[in-house]
């Protein structure tokens, strides 16, 4: 007797600045879940979270996927945020969040699934939350002895009055040198990041980031190669081959990251002997330090001259678009897209 397909509830969109990236990622994941043997294994029901945080069922979710961008809902709703699960959710056996940024990658949705006592793809509440907040993440990396570029952490409230603001600017200039990068602590995909080269740009960058997040980080800029490694599994983590992102822009900003032709990837990266192994090992150590399981993409900086390797960040729900490194790294490691999403769903039930 044939077993019935497992019903996957795929959640995408979300109340975050990476809403449209999530729509593109969801399209790729759904394609993988409906390809090859997966077409017999799984029944996929998409659920859409709009930019006000409201959940929508399969019919409207499919319309958003077809348009590849947010569209007007079929009827107006005055309330914002989550109120109840849409129709069709009662049949879901495994949840698959394809949400990037706050309110999706930060442990909030994972907590909902955990309260529902239903399996879900990806990291749990703790790993998701710590990985989302760059200051908490950096503290965990430091505790694990992983090398990082110098940085200064602060709160947006530190910029409140002129005296405190000047003190913050003086502190950053004393501990770092230009250029440096100002980042909101809880956004991804380079959203809200500024490269600053002087005090005026630093102040402007801090004000911009403070509008997006109450916690900020300023990192030392380094002239280094950008390397990435993918991680997969739950009880037994494994790392992929190492890839490199190359670009002609001044830095790897949102436009460069998501516009075709503005960046290229080299997989596997051409590295001196032993460097790839260091990246792969440190990627696993980073996941262990933050309690991350399921999947992750871990990013590094590498200096060709000094041979210094710095861990940059970890993404627990990495992009799954046609230009995203996570699926490409596994493809180069011998794991096709349909195999990859199958393994991710399997890991949810481990």
Curated annotation (Swiss-Prot):
Instruction: Name the domain of life this protein comes from.
Output: Bacteria
Q: In which pathway does it act?
A: Cell wall biogenesis; peptidoglycan biosynthesis
- Residues holding ATP: 173-228
The cofactors it requires, by name, are: Mg(2+); Mn(2+)
| Keywords, comma-separated and alphabetical | ATP-binding, Cell shape, Cell wall biogenesis/degradation, Cytoplasm, Ligase, Magnesium, Manganese, Metal-binding, Nucleotide-binding, Peptidoglycan synthesis
Q: Which InterPro entries match?
A: ATP-grasp, ATP_grasp_subdomain_1, D-Ala_lig_Van_CS, D_ala_D_ala, Dala_Dala_lig_C, Dala_Dala_lig_N, PreATP-grasp_dom_sf
| Residues reported in the UniProt entry to bind Mg(2+) 2 | 313, 315
- Cell location: Cytoplasm
- A Gene Ontology cellular-component term: cytosol
Its predominant location is cytoplasm
Sites binding Mg(2+) 1 sit at 299, 313
Annotated GO molecular function terms are:
ATP binding; D-alanine-D-alanine ligase activity; metal ion binding
- Biological process according to GO: cell wall organization; peptidoglycan biosynthetic process; regulation of cell shape
Q: Does the keyword Membrane apply?
A: no
**EC assignment:** 6.3.2.4
What's this chain's function?
A: Cell wall formation.
Query: What protein family is recorded?
Result: Belongs to the D-alanine--D-alanine ligase family.
Q: PANTHER family under this entry?
A: D-ALANINE--D-ALANINE LIGASE (PTHR23132), D-ALANINE--D-ALANINE LIGASE A (PTHR23132:SF25)
UniProt protein name: D-alanine--D-alanine ligase
Q: Which classification does the entry list for the species?
A: Bacteria, Bacillati, Cyanobacteriota, Cyanophyceae, Synechococcales
């Amino acid at each position: 007797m044939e077993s019935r397909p497992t019903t996957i509830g795929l959640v995408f969109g979300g109340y975050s600045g990476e809403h449209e990236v999530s729509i593109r990622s969801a399209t790729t994941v759904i394609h993988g879940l409906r390809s090859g043997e997966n077409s017999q294994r799984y029944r996929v029901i998409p659920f859409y979270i709009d930019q006000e945080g409201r959940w929508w069922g399969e019919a409207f979710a499919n319309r958003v996927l077809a348009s590849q961008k947010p569209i007007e809902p079929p009827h107006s709703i005055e309330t914002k945020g989550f109120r109840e699960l849409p129709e069709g959710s009662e049949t879901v056996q495994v949840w698959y969040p394809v949400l990037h940024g706050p309110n999706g990658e930060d442990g909030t949705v994972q907590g909902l699934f955990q309260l529902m006592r239903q399996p879900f793809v990806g990291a749990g509440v703790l790993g998701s939350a710590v990985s989302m907040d760059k200051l908490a993440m950096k503290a965990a990396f430091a505790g694990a002895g992983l090398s990082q570029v110098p940085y200064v952490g602060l709160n947006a409230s530190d910029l409140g009055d002129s005296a405190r603001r000047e003190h913050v600017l003086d502190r950053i200039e004393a501990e770092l040198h230009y250029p440096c990068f100002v980042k909101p602590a809880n956004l991804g995909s380079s959203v809200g990041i500024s490269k600053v080269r002087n005090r005026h740009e630093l102040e402007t960058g801090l004000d911009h980031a403070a509008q997006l997040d109450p916690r900020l980080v300023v990192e030392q800029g380094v002239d280094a190669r950008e390397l990435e490694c993918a991680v997969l599994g739950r009880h037994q983590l494994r790392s992929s081959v190492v890839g490199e992102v190359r670009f002609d822009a001044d830095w790897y900003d949102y436009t460069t990251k998501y516009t075709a032709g503005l960046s290229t990837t080299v997989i596997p990266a051409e590295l001196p002997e032993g460097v790839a192994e260091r990246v792969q090992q440190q990627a696993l150590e980073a996941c262990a330090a933050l309690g991350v399981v399921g999947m992750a993409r871990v990013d590094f900086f590498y200096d060709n001259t000094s041979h210094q390797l710095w861990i940059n960040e970890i993404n627990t729900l990495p992009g799954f678009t046609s230009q995203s490194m996570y699926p490409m790294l596994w493809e180069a490691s011998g794991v096709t897209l349909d195999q990859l999403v199958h393994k991710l769903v399997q890991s949810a039930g481990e």
